[in-house]
Protein backbone atom coordinates (compact mmCIF):
# COMPACT_ATOMS: atom_id res chain seq x y z
CA UNK A 1 0.00 0.00 0.00
CA UNK A 2 1.25 3.49 -0.84
CA UNK A 3 1.04 5.43 2.39
CA UNK A 4 -0.96 8.57 3.09
CA UNK A 5 -2.21 9.47 -0.37
CA UNK A 6 -5.49 10.61 -1.91
CA UNK A 7 -6.06 9.63 -5.54
CA UNK A 8 -8.76 11.26 -7.69
CA UNK A 9 -9.93 9.61 -10.89
CA UNK A 10 -12.41 10.01 -13.73
CA UNK A 11 -13.69 7.77 -16.51
CA UNK A 12 -13.53 9.00 -20.10
CA UNK A 13 -16.89 7.53 -21.10
CA UNK A 14 -18.73 7.41 -17.77
CA UNK A 15 -20.32 10.31 -15.89
CA UNK A 16 -18.90 9.32 -12.51
CA UNK A 17 -15.90 10.43 -10.52
CA UNK A 18 -14.03 8.65 -7.79
CA UNK A 19 -11.46 8.98 -5.04
CA UNK A 20 -9.29 6.47 -3.21
CA UNK A 21 -7.65 7.25 0.14
CA UNK A 22 -5.04 5.10 1.90
CA UNK A 23 -3.60 6.36 5.20
CA UNK A 24 -1.06 4.81 7.55
CA UNK A 25 1.46 7.22 9.10
CA UNK A 26 -0.97 10.09 9.74
CA UNK A 27 -3.50 7.68 11.25
CA UNK A 28 -0.95 6.10 13.59
CA UNK A 29 0.25 9.53 14.73
CA UNK A 30 -3.32 10.63 15.39
CA UNK A 31 -4.27 7.71 17.65
CA UNK A 32 -0.87 7.11 19.30
CA UNK A 33 -0.83 7.18 23.13
CA UNK A 34 -4.56 7.93 23.44
CA UNK A 35 -5.47 4.40 24.57
CA UNK A 36 -8.70 4.38 22.60
CA UNK A 37 -10.71 1.14 22.44
CA UNK A 38 -10.38 -0.56 19.03
CA UNK A 39 -13.93 0.43 18.06
CA UNK A 40 -13.11 4.11 18.68
CA UNK A 41 -9.83 3.81 16.75
CA UNK A 42 -11.80 2.38 13.83
CA UNK A 43 -14.39 5.16 14.04
CA UNK A 44 -11.66 7.82 14.02
CA UNK A 45 -9.99 6.07 11.08
CA UNK A 46 -13.20 6.15 9.07
CA UNK A 47 -13.83 9.76 10.06
CA UNK A 48 -10.28 10.69 9.01
CA UNK A 49 -10.77 9.08 5.60
CA UNK A 50 -14.18 10.71 5.23
CA UNK A 51 -12.74 14.15 6.00
CA UNK A 52 -9.97 13.69 3.43
CA UNK A 53 -12.55 12.66 0.83
CA UNK A 54 -14.87 15.56 1.68
CA UNK A 55 -11.99 18.03 1.51
CA UNK A 56 -11.12 16.90 -2.00
CA UNK A 57 -14.76 16.66 -3.10
CA UNK A 58 -16.08 20.00 -1.87
CA UNK A 59 -13.18 21.93 -3.45
CA UNK A 60 -12.48 24.85 -1.14
CA UNK A 61 -9.45 26.65 0.24
CA UNK A 62 -9.47 26.84 4.01
CA UNK A 63 -10.31 24.63 6.96
CA UNK A 64 -12.81 21.83 7.57
CA UNK A 65 -14.12 20.11 10.69
CA UNK A 66 -16.21 16.94 10.63
CA UNK A 67 -17.69 16.08 14.03
CA UNK A 68 -19.92 13.30 15.31
CA UNK A 69 -21.64 14.10 18.60
CA UNK A 70 -24.36 12.40 20.59
CA UNK A 71 -25.50 10.81 23.83
CA UNK A 72 -23.67 7.50 23.42
CA UNK A 73 -20.42 6.21 24.97
CA UNK A 74 -18.44 8.46 22.60
CA UNK A 75 -19.43 12.02 23.49
CA UNK A 76 -17.84 13.30 20.30
CA UNK A 77 -15.30 12.41 17.63
CA UNK A 78 -13.88 15.14 15.40
CA UNK A 79 -11.37 15.54 12.60
CA UNK A 80 -9.97 18.98 11.80
CA UNK A 81 -8.21 19.53 8.49
CA UNK A 82 -7.55 21.86 5.60
CA UNK A 83 -7.37 21.84 1.82
CA UNK A 84 -3.68 20.80 2.00
CA UNK A 85 -4.82 17.56 3.69
CA UNK A 86 -3.21 18.47 7.02
CA UNK A 87 -5.29 16.49 9.52
CA UNK A 88 -5.69 16.00 13.26
CA UNK A 89 -8.42 14.33 15.29
CA UNK A 90 -9.66 13.34 18.72
CA UNK A 91 -12.45 11.43 20.45
CA UNK A 92 -13.92 11.96 23.92
CA UNK A 93 -15.58 9.12 25.82
CA UNK A 94 -18.22 9.52 28.49
CA UNK A 95 -19.00 5.86 29.29
CA UNK A 96 -17.75 2.34 28.57
CA UNK A 97 -17.66 1.34 24.91
CA UNK A 98 -19.43 -1.93 24.16
CA UNK A 99 -20.56 -1.67 20.51
CA UNK A 100 -18.90 -0.84 17.21
CA UNK A 101 -21.48 0.83 14.93
CA UNK A 102 -22.00 4.58 14.74
CA UNK A 103 -25.36 4.14 16.49
CA UNK A 104 -23.79 2.10 19.30
CA UNK A 105 -20.85 4.49 19.74
CA UNK A 106 -22.43 7.92 19.25
CA UNK A 107 -26.06 7.11 20.09
CA UNK A 108 -28.67 9.71 19.18
CA UNK A 109 -26.82 12.60 17.63
CA UNK A 110 -25.61 14.53 14.62
CA UNK A 111 -22.80 14.82 12.13
CA UNK A 112 -21.70 18.43 11.78
CA UNK A 113 -19.58 19.49 8.80
CA UNK A 114 -18.09 22.97 9.13
CA UNK A 115 -16.13 24.63 6.34
CA UNK A 116 -14.26 27.86 7.04
CA UNK A 117 -12.92 29.14 3.70
CA UNK A 118 -9.93 31.44 3.47
CA UNK A 119 -12.22 33.82 1.60
CA UNK A 120 -15.98 33.89 1.86
CA UNK A 121 -18.54 32.88 4.43
CA UNK A 122 -18.43 29.97 6.83
CA UNK A 123 -20.66 27.02 5.94
CA UNK A 124 -22.14 24.43 8.29
CA UNK A 125 -24.14 21.33 7.40
CA UNK A 126 -25.88 19.22 10.04
CA UNK A 127 -27.12 15.69 9.39
CA UNK A 128 -28.91 13.47 11.95
CA UNK A 129 -27.10 10.19 12.59
CA UNK A 130 -29.90 7.93 11.42
CA UNK A 131 -27.78 5.09 10.01
CA UNK A 132 -25.65 2.29 11.42
CA UNK A 133 -22.49 3.15 9.48
CA UNK A 134 -20.52 6.33 8.85
CA UNK A 135 -20.48 5.66 5.11
CA UNK A 136 -24.29 5.73 5.03
CA UNK A 137 -24.30 8.98 7.04
CA UNK A 138 -21.92 10.64 4.55
CA UNK A 139 -23.98 9.37 1.63
CA UNK A 140 -27.08 10.88 3.25
CA UNK A 141 -25.24 14.20 3.57
CA UNK A 142 -24.57 14.33 -0.18
CA UNK A 143 -28.13 13.29 -1.00
CA UNK A 144 -29.43 16.09 1.22
CA UNK A 145 -26.98 18.89 0.41
CA UNK A 146 -26.08 18.31 -3.25
CA UNK A 147 -28.65 15.78 -4.50
CA UNK A 148 -25.82 13.66 -5.90
CA UNK A 149 -25.81 9.87 -5.71
CA UNK A 150 -22.74 8.89 -3.69
CA UNK A 151 -21.27 5.65 -2.35
CA UNK A 152 -18.42 5.05 0.08
CA UNK A 153 -16.54 2.00 1.28
CA UNK A 154 -14.28 2.13 4.36
CA UNK A 155 -11.71 -0.32 5.72
CA UNK A 156 -9.62 0.00 8.89
CA UNK A 157 -6.96 -2.03 10.67
CA UNK A 158 -6.38 -0.87 14.26
CA UNK A 159 -3.22 -2.93 14.93
CA UNK A 160 -1.07 -0.99 17.42
CA UNK A 161 1.70 0.88 15.58
CA UNK A 162 0.61 -0.48 12.22
CA UNK A 163 -2.91 0.93 11.91
CA UNK A 164 -4.36 1.69 8.48
CA UNK A 165 -7.47 3.51 7.28
CA UNK A 166 -8.69 3.44 3.69
CA UNK A 167 -11.70 4.50 1.70
CA UNK A 168 -13.21 4.35 -1.77
CA UNK A 169 -15.60 7.03 -3.05
CA UNK A 170 -17.90 7.21 -6.08
CA UNK A 171 -20.18 10.08 -7.07
CA UNK A 172 -22.28 10.84 -10.14
CA UNK A 173 -21.40 13.86 -12.23
CA UNK A 174 -24.31 16.29 -12.77
CA UNK A 175 -24.35 15.93 -16.56
CA UNK A 176 -26.82 13.61 -18.33
CA UNK A 177 -29.01 12.38 -15.46
CA UNK A 178 -30.19 9.09 -16.99
CA UNK A 179 -26.74 8.19 -18.30
CA UNK A 180 -25.18 9.13 -14.95
CA UNK A 181 -27.55 6.79 -13.10
CA UNK A 182 -26.70 3.90 -15.42
CA UNK A 183 -22.96 4.61 -15.27
CA UNK A 184 -23.08 4.85 -11.50
CA UNK A 185 -24.96 1.55 -11.12
CA UNK A 186 -22.32 -0.17 -13.27
CA UNK A 187 -19.37 1.16 -11.26
CA UNK A 188 -21.14 0.66 -7.94
CA UNK A 189 -21.59 -3.04 -8.72
CA UNK A 190 -17.89 -3.36 -9.54
CA UNK A 191 -16.86 -1.45 -6.42
CA UNK A 192 -18.95 -3.73 -4.21
CA UNK A 193 -16.49 -6.52 -5.01
CA UNK A 194 -13.64 -4.77 -3.18
CA UNK A 195 -12.37 -6.60 -0.09
CA UNK A 196 -11.10 -4.82 3.02
CA UNK A 197 -7.71 -6.51 2.74
CA UNK A 198 -7.34 -5.26 -0.85
CA UNK A 199 -7.96 -1.65 0.20
CA UNK A 200 -5.59 -2.03 3.14
CA UNK A 201 -2.71 -3.88 1.48
CA UNK A 202 -2.62 -3.15 -2.27
CA UNK A 203 -1.33 0.03 -3.89
CA UNK A 204 -3.85 2.38 -5.49
CA UNK A 205 -3.06 1.49 -9.11
CA UNK A 206 -3.55 -2.22 -8.41
CA UNK A 207 -6.86 -1.58 -6.62
CA UNK A 208 -8.23 0.58 -9.42
CA UNK A 209 -7.03 -1.77 -12.15
CA UNK A 210 -8.65 -4.76 -10.45
CA UNK A 211 -11.94 -2.93 -10.02
CA UNK A 212 -12.24 -0.99 -13.26
CA UNK A 213 -9.80 -2.52 -15.77
CA UNK A 214 -12.40 -2.44 -18.57
CA UNK A 215 -13.42 1.17 -17.89
CA UNK A 216 -9.97 2.79 -18.06
CA UNK A 217 -9.94 5.11 -15.03
CA UNK A 218 -7.87 8.26 -15.58
CA UNK A 219 -5.97 8.83 -12.33
CA UNK A 220 -4.68 12.29 -11.42
CA UNK A 221 -1.56 13.22 -9.48
CA UNK A 222 -2.07 12.03 -5.87
CA UNK A 223 -2.27 14.45 -2.95
CA UNK A 224 -0.32 13.63 0.21
CA UNK A 225 -2.04 13.44 3.60
CA UNK A 226 -0.27 14.27 6.85
CA UNK A 227 -0.96 14.56 10.56
CA UNK A 228 -0.42 18.14 11.67
CA UNK A 229 -1.59 19.22 15.08
CA UNK A 230 -1.05 22.96 14.85
CA UNK A 231 -0.52 23.52 18.57
CA UNK A 232 2.31 25.89 19.57
CA UNK A 233 3.69 27.39 22.74
CA UNK A 234 2.55 30.82 21.52
CA UNK A 235 -1.07 29.67 21.07
CA UNK A 236 -0.98 28.12 24.53
CA UNK A 237 0.29 31.39 26.01
CA UNK A 238 -2.57 33.26 24.34
CA UNK A 239 -5.04 30.88 25.97
CA UNK A 240 -3.44 31.43 29.39
CA UNK A 241 -3.99 35.19 29.14
CA UNK A 242 -7.73 34.59 29.55
CA UNK A 243 -7.14 33.01 32.97
CA UNK A 244 -5.43 36.09 34.39
CA UNK A 245 -1.97 36.73 35.80
CA UNK A 246 -2.73 36.37 39.51
CA UNK A 247 -4.60 33.08 39.07
CA UNK A 248 -1.67 31.71 37.08
CA UNK A 249 0.88 32.88 39.66
CA UNK A 250 -1.17 31.26 42.42
CA UNK A 251 -1.15 28.02 40.44
CA UNK A 252 2.64 28.20 40.00
CA UNK A 253 3.08 28.89 43.73
CA UNK A 254 1.04 25.80 44.57
CA UNK A 255 2.38 23.35 41.98
CA UNK A 256 5.78 24.77 40.99
CA UNK A 257 4.78 25.15 37.35
CA UNK A 258 1.79 25.10 35.02
CA UNK A 259 1.44 22.17 32.62
CA UNK A 260 -0.88 22.49 29.63
CA UNK A 261 -1.33 19.38 27.47
CA UNK A 262 -2.57 19.48 23.87
CA UNK A 263 -5.69 17.32 23.58
CA UNK A 264 -4.78 16.26 20.04
CA UNK A 265 -1.07 15.34 20.11
CA UNK A 266 -0.65 15.17 23.92
CA UNK A 267 2.39 17.46 23.86
CA UNK A 268 3.04 19.19 27.20
CA UNK A 269 3.79 22.91 27.52
CA UNK A 270 5.37 23.97 30.84
CA UNK A 271 5.33 27.49 32.31
CA UNK A 272 7.13 28.70 35.45
CA UNK A 273 6.75 31.97 37.37
CA UNK A 274 8.99 33.93 35.01
CA UNK A 275 7.13 32.58 31.97
CA UNK A 276 3.83 33.80 33.46
CA UNK A 277 5.26 37.26 34.09
CA UNK A 278 6.65 37.41 30.55
CA UNK A 279 3.21 36.59 29.13
CA UNK A 280 1.74 39.72 30.70
CA UNK A 281 4.68 42.06 29.95
From Swiss-Prot:
Principal subcellular localization: cytoplasm
Annotated GO biological process: protein refolding
Keywords: Chaperone, Cytoplasm, Disulfide bond, Redox-active center, Zinc
CDD domains: Hsp33 (cd00498)
Pfam families per UniProt: HSP33 (PF01430)
Molecular function GO labels: protein folding chaperone; unfolded protein binding
Subcellular location: Cytoplasm
UniProt key word Cytoplasm: yes
UniProt cross-references to InterPro entries, sorted A to Z: Heat_shock_Hsp33, Heat_shock_Hsp33_C, Heat_shock_Hsp33_N, Hsp33_helix_hairpin_bin_dom_sf
Disulfide bonds, paired cysteine numbers: 229-231, 262-265
Record PTM: Under oxidizing conditions two disulfide bonds are formed involving the reactive cysteines. Under reducing conditions zinc is bound to the reactive cysteines and the protein is inactive.
Family: Belongs to the HSP33 family.
Physiological role: Redox regulated molecular chaperone. Protects both thermally unfolding and oxidatively damaged proteins from irreversible aggregation. Plays an important role in the bacterial defense system toward oxidative stress.
Protein name: 33 kDa chaperonin
Naturally occurring in which organism (per UniProt): Pseudoalteromonas translucida (strain TAC 125)
